Amino acid sequence: MAGALCVTLLLLLSTNTVSGRKTWRRRGQQIVPSGRERSEGGDESFPLDFTAVEGNMDNFMAQIKSLAQSLYPCSAQRLDDEMKLHILHNKSVTCNDGSSAGYYLKESKGSRRWLVFLEGGWYCISHENCDLRYDTMRRLMSSKAWPPAKTASGILSTQPEENPHWWNANMVFIPYCSSDVWSGASPKTEKSGYAFMGSLIIQEVVKELLGKGLDAAKVLLLAGSSAGGTGVLLNVDLVADLLEELGYPGIQVRGLSDSGWFLDNKQYRRTDCTDIITCAPTEAIQRGIRYWSSMVPERCKQQFKEGEEWNCFFGYKIYPTLRSPVFVVQWLFDEAQLTVDNVHLSGQPVQESQWLYIQNLGRELRNTLKDVGASFAPACLAHEVITRSHWTEIQVRGTSLPRALHCWDRRLQETNKNSKVPLKGCPFHLMDSCPWPQCNPTCPSIRDHFTGQEMSVVQFLMHLGFDVQKMASQQGMEPGKLLGVLSS
C-alpha cells in the first residue's frame, strides 16, 4: 500500500508544483485507494481534505508533507522485497547431508493469506547418483551455503504489476534440499549416508509458521514447481490434516502444482536406468520410493496393491484421491517429460516417428487433465512457469494464468470444490486444443541449442519437420496468421 501511495504523492506534488494557482472545483472529496492498493486486512486509508485547498495551497501542501512523513520512505521500498532465511529450530529435520533445513519468509502484516512454495530440482535414487549430485549441485542437498536473504519473482513477487492477486500475501519459499520429491521421512544413517526428509521438512516449516502469524490465516496455498509441483500433490492433504490435528481446522488449505504432472508412459527409446535423466519415470520412482522411505498419502495408497505405492507420484492417479482443492498448471509438451522419454529436439530435424510421439504426448496429457476441475495447460515446449517474471503473459483462450487462478479463488470462496462451471467471464479450466508444440502464440520464446538465437514459432515447427509455409500457402494466408487461427 505504501508503494502505491508514494507514487500518488509524487504525482500530486508534481501536479501542484506546475499548477499551484489552479482552484479545485470538487469539494468534500477524498482520495481513496483502489482495491489493489488496499490491504485485505483492512489497512487504514489516508484521506486528504480538499475542502481546505480552495484559496489556500499552503494548507494543502502541508497536508501532503505530513502524509509523506507518516509513510515508509519511498526510497526504501525495494529493501522490503527480500525474503529472510530462517533455519528450523528442530535440528533433527535436515537436508540430505545432515545440515539443518529451513525456509525463507517475507511477512505481510495484516494479510491472512499465506503462500508456501516448494522448490524443484529433480532427485537422486541411489548412493552413486546422490554422490554425483552432491558434487555438482550441493545447494540442492545442503543448507550450508544458502544466502541469508533472497528475492523472488512470479507468484512470489511483492510487486502488483508482476503478481496481480497474490502480491500482498505472506510469502514462504522452502529450498529443496532432500532430493526425494518432497516425500521422504528417513534420517541420515551410516549405511545410507544421506537423509531424505522432504515431507517432514514441510510439516516442520508449517509448525514454525503458526508462531509467525499462520495461526490467524484464512488461506494457505501450497505451491511448487517441477519436483515441488509433484510434492504439492503428495503433501497438500497431509498439511491440511496436520493443521486440523493442531487445532486449526479453519485454515483453508489449497494446492497449486506447476510442471509436476508427469506421465508414466513408455519412453520414445527405451534405455537402461543408468542415471536419473535417461531412467524411465516409473522405474526411477520405484527405485526412489524405497531409497527415500517415502510417505505416501493413505487415501492414495489404499488404491493400489502393497509395493505399488509409486503410482501416487503420478498426478492423474493421485488427484482423484485428494480432498484439498488443487489447481494444476502443466505445459502440454513439458521439457522434463520429453527428456525422461528420451525425446531430443536439438540437432537435426526430428524423424516422423518422433514427431508423432510428441503429438501423442500432448493428446495423452490433455486426456489426463480433462477431469481436473481447475487447470491451465498451454501447448508450449517449456518447464515451470509460476515463478517466472513472464508468467502473466501466457494465455489460453484469452485468459492469463493469474486471471485463471483468481477465478478459481473466487469459485472456492463459494465452496464449490473442483467445479468446472465457470463464473461469468471468469474461466479456470483452460486447455489448448491445437496439436503441436508452440502453436499457442503466447508461448515463451525458445532458442536454438547450438546458436543460442531465439527461434520464431514458424522456424521451430519447420525444424521439427512441420511444413508451416506449405500449409499456410494452401490456406491462402501468412504462416503467423495460420498459427493464430489454429491456436484460437
From Swiss-Prot:
It is an enzyme of class 3 (hydrolase). One of its GO terms (biological process) is negative regulation of Wnt signaling pathway. Glycans are attached at N90. InterPro entries: PAE/NOTUM (IPR004963). Disulfide bonds: none annotated. Its EC number is 3.1.1.98. It catalyses: [Wnt protein]-O-(9Z)-hexadecenoyl-L-serine + H2O = [Wnt protein]-L-serine + (9Z)-hexadecenoate + H(+). One of its GO terms (molecular function) is palmitoleyl hydrolase activity. GO terms for cellular component: extracellular region. It holds the Pfam family PAE. Residues 1-20 form the signal peptide. It is found in: Secreted. Expressed in the egg and through cleavage to gastrulation stages. Enriched in the animal (prospective ectoderm) and dorsal regions in early gastrula. Shows a dynamic expression during embryogenesis, in particular during neural induction and antero-posterior (AP) patterning. The active site is at S226 (charge relay system), D334 (charge relay system), H383 (charge relay system). Belongs to the pectinacetylesterase family. Notum subfamily. Carboxylesterase that acts as a key negative regulator of the Wnt signaling pathway by specifically mediating depalmitoleoylation of WNT proteins. Serine palmitoleoylation of WNT proteins is required for efficient binding to frizzled receptors. Functions in the prospective ectoderm and is required for neural induction. This is Palmitoleoyl-protein carboxylesterase notum1. It comes from Xenopus laevis (African clawed frog). The lineage of its organism: Eukaryota, Metazoa, Chordata, Craniata, Vertebrata. The gene is notum1.
